[in-house]
Amino acid sequence: MTRELLLGALLIVASFGTALLSAVAGFGGGVLLLPVFVAVFGPRDAVAVLTVAQLASNGSRVWFNRHEVDRRLVRIFAAGAVPAAVAGALLLTSAPLQALTRVIGLFLLAMVVWRRVRPNTARVGDRGFAALGAASGFGSALVGSVGPMVAPFFLARGMVRGAYIGTEAASAVVMHLTKLVVFGAAAVLTWRTGLIGLALAPAAASGAWTGKKVLDRLPVNVFVILVEAGLIISGLLLLLTGG
């Protein structure tokens, strides 16, 4: 019992801390929790727990910005995202654990590289956005969250503030719901993992709120370095050890 309480406290602190860091640094989000979840739950359950937590987080963002959501763009994104998320989720349920762990490690390293070298993102048309949805749905099913890589394409459509936040979050909700249906059918998502993911959502929301409060008081570069260092170290460990 004591061990479970300590583990729960660790996960709450990790959720709060990573949300705070990502809110100040401007990127990272749920991705920062991946190595923590992998260490605690293993790679397969880690993606399921992160998916539940991300669904709760994105769902609240959709609600707060519901009047500004571009529903047409969400439908276009979903046309590619839903079938691809099903395919990715099915692959996750059967993928060897060591291989899956290394895929997550590569993804964490790719996050840092993408941030450093990404080109200016051109505006893509409707077909391109459906293709983006497919790539996002498949990738999200394997690693839990690809938001930081997808966000520039929403911004390139001229979206700002509530329209951007709500539309990007609504697109993520579609992917997460699709994945959870498959995870539930394949017994990857259990009551235990689902409740853990939901329980961590308030801690992440509190961390994000705190991060916004301290954003103007602390040097952002310090937080960016910390986030990137954490992603690199975690990615290398997962890649080299396979869990």
Annotated model-derived regions:
Residues 89-98, 183-195, 240-243:
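Membrane-interface helix termini and inter-helical loops of multi-pass transporters
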Residues 58-66, 89, 94, 103-127, ...:
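Transmembrane helix exit motif
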Residues 208-231:
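Interfacial loop-to-transmembrane junctions
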Residues 39, 93, 156-157, 216, ...:
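Transmembrane helix-loop junction
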Residues 35, 39-44, 78-89, 111, ...:
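Small-residue-rich segments of transmembrane alpha-helices in multi-pass membrane proteins
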Residues 8-76, 133-137, 147-201, 208:
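Small-residue-rich hydrophobic segments that form or flank transmembrane alpha-helices
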Residues 8, 51, 105-108, 112, ...:
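Residues within membrane-spanning alpha-helices of integral membrane proteins
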Residues 71-76, 94-108, 126, 193, ...:
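Loop-to-transmembrane alpha-helix entry segments
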